[in-house]
Amino acid sequence: MDLLFAHGDDGSPILDHAPDPGTAAAQASPVPRQPQEGFLADITAEASNLARQRWAVVTPAGAEGARLEALIQPLVRARAEDQQADVLSIRVPPGMDAAAATAWKKDVFPALYGEQEAERPRYLLILGDLDQVSLDTQQVLAQDGFPGRLAFATDDGYGAYADKVLAWQREPARQDRARALFYTVHDGTRATTAGHARLIQPCHALCARTTRDKAREFPASAVEVHGRPTPDPDELLALAAARHPSVLLSMSHGLGPPRRRPWSPAEAREHQGAMSFGVEGALAAKDVGSVPFLPGGLWIYFACFGAGTPRTSAYKHWLDMLALHGMADLGPASATLRGLDQGGGFVSGLAKAALANPNGPLAVLGHIDLAWSYSYEELRVGNARGLTGSNRSRNFYNLITKLVAGERAGAALLALRLVLGDVSAELNDHYDRYKRGGTVEGATPADALALGNLWMLHQDLRGYALLGDPAVRLPLASPAPARSAPADSSGERGQVTLCGGDHPADRDAGALDRLEQAALAIAGGESPGVIAQKLGVPRSEVAEAAKIYRDAGRAALSALLGRGAQEKGRAP
């Protein structure tokens, strides 16, 4: 198990060696814990279909919530058009813990959408920092929804982000395939070395192989892995400057406080979770706030506190339990988690700056807590009370595949959410099995170690949070479908002439194909707003194309019926 967290002064890792489970204390007594109640998600419709899944805004209760929502009104109006329905404004009490958020979701939320499942919004844009709408609230909503969060240091950030999303949505897309980029900071530490070998390399290899052999399953224009042997922030900045829709998966330590003193609250909000480049410094908020950095792209940022810092860590009590049962090397990590932020938590300065940048990414996925290796390398207690690992890099391959294919960011996260559901079920089975035997955590230290590591996996997966509008997707043009030669070119088939404009042959064939596919999709029941967003054109254009296509088709069918009647009349 590896931790991606480094000191802010010298870039050295806080934990740079693997704990040895073989030294587990034989006499340690497990402390009973209560299992969490889980929720079942009912996923019945196409997850990226905004008209069916609905989109809503979640803000803190009171005047502050209304003020925050007013800052993104252009985006709210656009989403209302996309889903062909009014946007629901959801106000929640600030500071709710998990129990309060669960009770609110069960007792209050259904009345807001009329208690009709077809009207329940799943795409939920949360406005405000963690002290305004709590992290617990976001995680409870994520049990069967697709939440994303926007939080900025100034009001201007909200407007700038909304303008950026709408600009990419309305600008005609120039590329129909995305880049899949992988980047590792090779700082020589154990965690990044292992992360490169066990996540970046396997995931890159699988993406590259699928692109080569089954391009339709992973439609990327490039699958590239980067990271110089000597870390250099400028290398990443140059790589991310290209104005080409891209998904970036990066592996690095997240920046923590210096060894000799704690950060002030203001310093923590600006620097904690910045991308550590070891002795070469860090990629911080000031570095990504004004230069092109993954414009129109999506960033999976794998680092401690990369997305933010919670009020209290979800790991501390489990780290203490593992240390009690022999994994004493985890002590330094646990010590860093005492009173992370008494103010309620905060979104990282790096993510805020990147999202507020007009030439920055549309969304950032990262940890609001420590980032461990559990999500890509699951650890289990073996027969000899040693830890065995299984590579889970395919979790991230599945996520990147959905993003590259143009799925909405919130829907793509189902790839990780479903894994979390499996772990939750396993935890419930664990508690039920041992409760039958008269214990809760198990009778032996090995049982406690197994439970502790399973909970670490659960918390690691649960710690991922999406920053940005969950409805964003890579701005890609729909690829032109392959066209086959007509089965009958004898000239006997009816002809349809459209008035106005020059000869169809003078038109761009790809654009014509895209409009045809849009018209067919709308005829099949798809929302014009959804299709327009996918193509990057105004809704009015696809609606007009659908009408013209329908009218022309009906005219051709009418001519066909008329000709059939004439031929029938001439028959002997």
List each model region and its residues.
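Pre-catalytic or accessory/regulatory segments outside the catalytic core
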Residues: 1-140, 436-437, 443, 450-477, ...
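A domain-level signal for caspase-like cysteine endopeptidase catalytic cores
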Residues: 34-35, 52-88, 129-132, 140-274, ...
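Catalytic-core segments of thiol-dependent peptidases
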Residues: 79-80, 110-132, 207-348, 359, ...
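Active-site-proximal C-terminal subdomain of hydrolase catalytic domains
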Residues: 182-190, 205-209, 213, 305-492
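Short, amphipathic alpha-helical "recognition" segments used to contact nucleic acids or chromatin
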Residues: 509-526
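Short alpha-helical "recognition helix" segments of helix-turn-helix
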Residues: 531-533
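Major-groove recognition helix of helix-turn-helix-like DNA-binding domains
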Residues: 538-552
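Short Lys/Arg-enriched helix C-cap and helix-to-coil transition segments
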Residues: 550-570
